[in-house]
Amino acid sequence: MSAVTVRGVALGQGRPKIIVPIFAQTAADAAGQAAALGATAADLAELRLDPLRAGDGSLPDAAALCAAVRRVRAALDGRLPLLVTLRTGAEGGSRPCTPEEYAALLGGLLDAADAFELLDVEFAAVGQQLPALCRRAQAAGLAVVASKHDFAKTPPRAEMAAALCAMGDAGADIAKLAVMPAGPADAAELLAATALARSRRPALPLITMAMGPAGAVTRVCGGAFGSCATFGTAGVSSAPGQPDAARLRAALDALGGCLA
């Protein structure tokens, strides 16, 4: 697959990269988590903007979100690439907003494009606007991670592969898919869908995982099927089933060349 390289980290080349989430209700706490990431196994950081709240508990506007991004970048001190994610309630996040509000907030985040490298864009939320959003973000120097999450089930293999391919066809630099397995068979379906999508779009970097305990194996061995990154925690989890980043790094190192 073709690599997307950000701050010297090549997504789609070598072993799967470990993304560690920053998940906090205040910008100060988010910056504190960011400052501690240098001592972890993180290859990249993900700033989740959806849990952030203003001092009075209200939802921060785009300007406040941009300020939070800049504060986290300063705390990271240039050490790690930063993925910025505003996860909506419809896909497991804590930011209630309409599709129109979501698209407007993403557009507003481009004002801070010099402070991060990758922007998560929910495929279902933006729909036919994805190509235009990709072009705007890419013109601002960002790589786009188009994403789709299903917290209720694992769709059929063909449907999952088609979704990954569609995100790439719409202009995303990376396609991400997360599903909820009912058991090991569903986890295997997710891995098979990853391999199928990779065979159909060999140049498109993919990030895939099955969530929860039944999906844990996909977070470790996904690279063998075509996933270029996985999520691990450094004390704070942003999704069910995320393993400790240090233990995840040890597992990936043990598997070695099978995941390259």
Give the label of every model feature segment.
Residues F23, L44-A54, T85, T98, ...:
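Catalytic beta/alpha-barrel core
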Residues A36-L37, V72-A75, L109-A113, A137, ...:
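Generic structural signal for hydrophobic
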Residues G14-I18, A41-D43, D77-L82, A115-E117, ...:
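Short, well-ordered coil/turn segments that N-cap beta-strands
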Residues Q25-G38, C97-L110, P156-A166:
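Short, acidic/polar
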Residues F123-A260:
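Catalytic alpha/beta core domains of metabolic enzymes, predominantly
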Residues S58-A90, D111, L133-A146, A192-L204:
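Alpha-helix-loop-beta-strand connector modules within alpha/beta enzyme cores
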Residues M1-G32, L259-A260:
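N-terminal amphipathic alpha-helix/helix-capping segment at the start of soluble metabolic enzymes
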Residues A31, S58-R71, P99-L106, M160-A161, ...:
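Well-ordered, non-membrane alpha-helical segments in soluble/globular domains
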